Amino acid sequence: AHALLDHFGTLDAVFEASCEDMMRVPGVGENVATLLTLIPQVGRRYQMAKRRQQTILRSSEDAGNYLVPLYLYERTEVVYLLCLDAKCGLISCKEVGRGVVNAAEVSVRAIVETALSQKAVSVILSHNHVDAYALPSREDELTTRRIRDALLLVGITLADHIIVCGEDYVSFADSGLL
């Protein structure tokens, strides 16, 4: 543990390192490196399960505070769909897309099917920007409109689209982009 901290400098840097980078540190084998790369993923799942219980998302601030921890240590763009009931209670939080450092593929069909299967009244879409700002790109805006329109056809409201970058987030609803 000390060798890893000495090499990478911080615990954050250790958890963000790849298996290959960790195995370059003397005394760190494949098993240890693999275990350490799983810790952030396990932590995210634990936080999701813990926070899902009785979570109400009535505002962009509620949603942003829920979402920021889910993106900790992510090195690629990830898209989540938060399915809500009629009282803005969280039914589920599903990963619906994963990509590379600066882009994630999003299937409008998968989003609609997920929302329908969860019996959502409304949904919040979210994705992260890895090494940039939490500002929407033109492509983010166009994709959001396509998803909003598809959801409306089946009677589901897109309540918000939140972009997370580090500890910051931007709400499409608050920005007038929905």
Positions of the model-derived regions?
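A short amphipathic alpha-helix within small helical-bundle interaction modules
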Residues: 11-25
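Long, charged amphipathic helices and adjacent flexible linkers at domain junctions
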Residues: 43-64
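Histidine/lysine/aspartate-rich catalytic loop segments that bind and position anionic ligands
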Residues: 64-118, 122
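Conserved hydrophobic/aromatic pocket- or pore-lining residues that grip, position, or stack substrates
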Residues: 88, 125, 160
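Charged helix-capping and loop-helix junction motifs
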Residues: 107-109, 138-146
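Histidine-centered catalytic micro-motifs
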Residues: 122-133, 163
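Divalent-metal-activated hydrolytic enzyme cores
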Residues: 145-178
